[in-house]
């Protein structure tokens, strides 16, 4: 999907590696001249053409993929015909044309029984083009050079020039009246994702990045492949506030098997210790006793660094290492159910708590071993699992992109223009607002992992 957001304009030349990976299909222009289009773009163009035909609007292709050499020839032709000032205004310099992407189309329109691609004639068909523009997002297209955006795009309004970007980005751009340039710089927000079992948090981030076609995507607390539930994903400028969201308390429901301990402290690992389960202590009482603050030993399979090396690297190399301990607080913990050698707990913990380690410690307090069999993050801060969307729902456009301010729920301080300028320039300010700044050193992205 990211390739569909490739920006090519007067300031951004087409990259050679993009051209190497371009998959084109053969087709024909309105005058039967052979041409090519990127394969997904062509498929969606055909669907658009079919939809418009049902509305008695007949479109065809006037211009599609162009090589750099093609664009050079066009530049020279129009320069000779109309002069240098004209081509500077209306014709792209070679390597800066959208047509190099294979994603751009200049439409021809059937008027009075014949196709026309003459710009002056097309400009007289504004009413028809308005109908075309309205349904473009349904097929992943945008009007690339809209009215009133000339200073941003660098080109005059072209009703006939459309560009494939993918359905979700196209819908967002249409609703916000954004150009591609504006989408790339302005699109940001926070998604509440319901992560499924089997995927890593990185898998989710990568898929979200592909869906929206943007590079800046992060998350606020790793969930292991075994785990599911609330994963908060930040996009664009929202990536900068990820650490603030990570600091919020998290709520989990965990399944536990007694009598077994694995190297990973969950059921996916190799069994390293086992013993018959013979619990003489009261299970609920022991579980409740963990509502406290204590020094928790982190799992060896984690991204915590010791001497500049991640713990899981020591584990994979089978090298001994002293496991660090960190202070964590179990704010709430409750036994939900139990059956012989298994039980389920619900707990609310502070940042940095490993549920796998908590389960190991409960097992030891019971005089046996324990390993995690399932984990669901049901809440992070005020964000509940019922407010999340699955990846499949997001792909279908069924999601809400939350604003940074509504997620952080921080107080608003109004400032005057002078102070606003100082803040934007990064100047030091007197703390006249009595703001308490809490600083915690950055921790690995999966420090809140299960």
Description of each model-found segment:
Residues 73-79, 230-239, 245-248:
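Glycine-rich loop at the start of a catalytic domain that most often binds anionic cofactors/ligands
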Residues 139-140, 291-292, 364-371:
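A common structural junction motif
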Residues 1-64, 68-186:
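Extracytoplasmic cell-surface/polysaccharide-interacting catalytic and binding patches
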Residues 185-198, 202-223, 227-230, 281, ...:
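Accessory RNA 3′-end/elbow-binding domains used by RNA modification enzymes
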Residues 233, 254, 308, 358, ...:
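Residue-level signal for inorganic ion chemistry
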Residues 207-214, 232, 321-367:
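The conserved catalytic core of RNA pseudouridine synthases
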Residues 244-295:
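Acidic, low-complexity central loop/insert segments
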Residues 301-302, 306-331:
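Extended alpha-helical targeting/anchoring segments
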């Amino acid at each position: 999907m990211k390739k569909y957001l490739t920006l090519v304009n007067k300031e951004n030349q087409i990259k050679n590696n993009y051209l190497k990976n371009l998959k084109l299909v053969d087709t024909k222009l309105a005058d039967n001249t052979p041409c090519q289009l990127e394969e997904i773009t062509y498929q969606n163009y055909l669907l658009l053409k079919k939809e418009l035909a049902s509305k008695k609007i007949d479109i065809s292709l006037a211009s599609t993929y162009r090589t750099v050499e093609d664009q050079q020839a066009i530049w020279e032709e129009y320069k000779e015909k109309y002069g240098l000032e004209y081509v500077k205004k209306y014709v792209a310099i070679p390597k800066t044309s959208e047509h190099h992407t294979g994603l751009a189309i200049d439409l021809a329109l059937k008027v009075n029984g014949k196709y026309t691609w003459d710009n002056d004639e097309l400009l007289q068909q504004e009413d028809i083009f308005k109908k075309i523009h309205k349904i473009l997002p349904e097929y992943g297209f945008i009007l690339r050079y809209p009215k009133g955006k000339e200073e941003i795009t660098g080109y005059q309004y072209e009703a006939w020039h459309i560009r494939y970007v993918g359905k979700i980005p196209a819908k967002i751009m249409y609703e916000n009246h954004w150009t591609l340039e504006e989408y790339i710089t302005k699109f940001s927000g926070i998604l509440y994702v319901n992560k499924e079992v089997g995927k890593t948090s990185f898998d989710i981030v990568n898929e979200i990045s592909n869906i929206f076609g943007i590079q800046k995507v992060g998350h606020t607390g790793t969930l292991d492949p075994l785990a599911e539930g609330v994963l908060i994903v930040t996009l664009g400028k929202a990536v900068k506030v990820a650490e603030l969201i990570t600091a919020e308390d998290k709520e989990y429901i965990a399944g536990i098997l007694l009598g077994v301990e694995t190297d990973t402290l969950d059921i996916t690992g190799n069994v390293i210790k086992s013993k018959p389960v013979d619990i003489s202590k009261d299970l609920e009482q022991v579980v409740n006793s963990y509502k406290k603050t204590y020094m928790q030993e982190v799992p060896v399979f984690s991204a915590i660094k010791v001497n500049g090396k991640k713990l899981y690297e020591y584990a994979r190399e089978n090298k001994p290492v002293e496991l660090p301990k960190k202070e964590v607080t179990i704010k709430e913990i409750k036994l939900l159910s139990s059956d012989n050698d298994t039980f389920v707990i619900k707990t609310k913990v502070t940042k940095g708590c490993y549920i796998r380690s908590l389960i190991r410690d409960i097992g030891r307090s019971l005089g046996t071993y324990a390993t995690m069999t399932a984990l669901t993050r049901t809440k992070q801060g005020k964000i509940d699992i019922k407010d999340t969307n699955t990846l499949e729902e997001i792909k279908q456009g069924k999601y809400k992109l939350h604003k940074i301010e509504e997620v952080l729920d921080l107080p608003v301080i109004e400032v005057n223009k002078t102070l606003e300028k100082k803040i934007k320039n990064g100047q030091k300010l007197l703390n006249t607002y009595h703001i308490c700044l809490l600083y915690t050193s950055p921790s690995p992205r999966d420090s809140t992992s299960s």
